[in-house]
Amino acid sequence: MRRLGSVQRKMPCVFVTEVKEEPSTKREHQPFKVLATETLSHKALDADIHNAIPTEKVDGTCCYVTNYKGQPYLWARLDRKPNKLAEKRFKNFLHLKQNSKEFFWNVEEDFKPVPECWIPAKEIEQINGNPIPDENGHIPGWVPVEKNSKQHCWHSSVVDYESEIALVLRHHPDDPGLLEISAVPLSDLLEQTLELIGTNINGNPYGLGSKKHPLHLLIPHGAFQIRNLPTLKHSDLLSWFDGCREGKIEGIVWHCNDGCLIKVHRHHLGLCWPIPDTYMNSKPVIINMNLNKYEYAFDAKCLFNHFSKIDNQKFGRLKDIILTV
């Protein structure tokens, strides 16, 4: 199977979208909705969407694995945003022109400072070595997740840099109907993006862990391919999301042959998210966490150690996993 694309920028919707002046169900205090029309977008058609690989859009926070300090590291998303003065100028410009591409940015003066270790996301257009902000005036980028980081404590809980491993959820290699939680070498994930999900991420739509025993996992983007997706018609996709077990997901991301990623979210179709019973929680999950091969004493409180105590145990669904000290 070919390696699927990584998420380095905002993904366009598979359909042309329109704005409706009614309260959003996705974001509190947003007085409008962005809804899909029945017309496929030019970007989707240009990327040959009909021959793309559809995958589950997972609800978490985006991460990236690349080298830092001479070894593979997990990186957290950090968008560089304009300062107040530049943001005001940008909003006034949009109000008059409504085309963000015509706005002139001074990258060195218009943006808030970021840590020295910050890097811009790949595939970002550049002029004279400076990354160009997206249509929202943001420059997508990454910062490395340091060990014991307070700011990124949930990110750091799913990696161990001494053993160079990550805590990953994906399909069991021999049984597509079974999920597996295992320790994966960070080197195997180099230049991939992943989704961090769990107790303290995005309201925990998958019901993982608890406040007393938080649980977080990484899912490589494109890990959950969708079989038997209906045709790319608005009505068919709406029926699929609303009426079948496989449709109980946040959305779909199509991985196109040219590397382009195209999405549709339940909210684009006027459907709710989160929902009570997700497709991810309909599958059994097995723990594969034998740490004996690592010549290293894992911290007694770390997730890897907790999972090693239930190695080879099988659970009916993800939310049934309760880690105790």
Swiss-Prot record:
The keyword Repeat does not apply. The keyword Ligase applies. It comes from the Eukaryota. It comes from Bos taurus. One of its GO terms (molecular function) is ATP binding. Functions as an RNA ligase, in vitro. The ligation reaction entails three nucleotidyl transfer steps. In the first step, the RNA ligase reacts with ATP in the absence of nucleic acid to form a covalent ligase-AMP intermediate and release pyrophosphate. In step 2, the ligase-AMP binds to the nucleic acid and transfers the adenylate to the 5'-PO4 terminus to form an adenylylated intermediate. In step 3, the RNA ligase directs the attack of the 3'-OH on the 5'-phosphoanhydride linkage, resulting in a repaired 3'-5' phosphodiester and release of AMP. One of its GO terms (biological process) is response to reactive oxygen species. AMPylates itself (auto-AMPylation). Keywords: ATP-binding, Ligase, Nucleotide-binding, RNA repair. This is RNA ligase 1. It is an enzyme of class 6 (ligase). Its EC number is 6.5.1.3. Its cofactor is Mg(2+); Mn(2+).
